Design a protein with these regions (language model features):
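Short beta-strand His + acidic residue motifs that chelate non-heme Fe in jelly-roll/DSBH
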Residues: 41-43, 61-62, 78, 84-90
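Conserved short histidine dyad/triad with adjacent acidic residue
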Residues: 16, 31-46
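Glycine- and acidic-residue-biased ligand/ion/polar-headgroup-sensing regions
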Residues: 48-59, 64
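Short acidic-glycine-tyrosine-enriched beta hairpin
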Residues: 65-80
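Structural motif
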Residues: 58-60, 67, 83, 93
Length: 113
């Protein structure tokens, strides 16, 4: 069993987003992103399946043409290849997890011959 202390893994930077890779496996990647007030993750297209959850704080999540403000206690599913940006518009720190997994059809299943 491996317990990861999210507080110990926090990385905050004055000039850019903080980033910590928590899990790096063949079919799963989990990163923690930390934003100071007014910082953001610039718009980009997500290439794997992505699920986001806020650890603490509240962020504004732009996914495609939709915008939602979200705090802790929810999961936000981001469709494959969607444009996404995230902003911390409040006067408090924001920490969230980014969970990435490949498309199911990209996973090759080994069969016994």
């Amino acid at each position: 069993m491996d317990a990861i202390n999210l507080k110990e893994k926090e990385v905050f930077k004055k000039e850019d987003r903080g980033f910590a890779n928590l899990v790096e496996e063949e079919y799963l990647q989990i990163n923690q992103v930390c934003l100071e007030p007014s910082q953001q993750v610039l718009r980009h297209n997500v290439n794997p399946n992505v699920t986001l959850t806020v650890v603490y704080g509240e962020g504004t999540f732009h996914i495609g043409d939709e915008v939602t403000r979200m705090g802790s206690g929810k999961l936000l599913r981001v469709p494959f290849q969607s444009p996404m940006s995230i902003k911390n518009e409040l006067n408090q720190r924001l920490a969230f997890l980014v969970m990435k997994a490949p498309q199911l059809n990209e996973i090759q299943v080994e069969t016994k011959a």
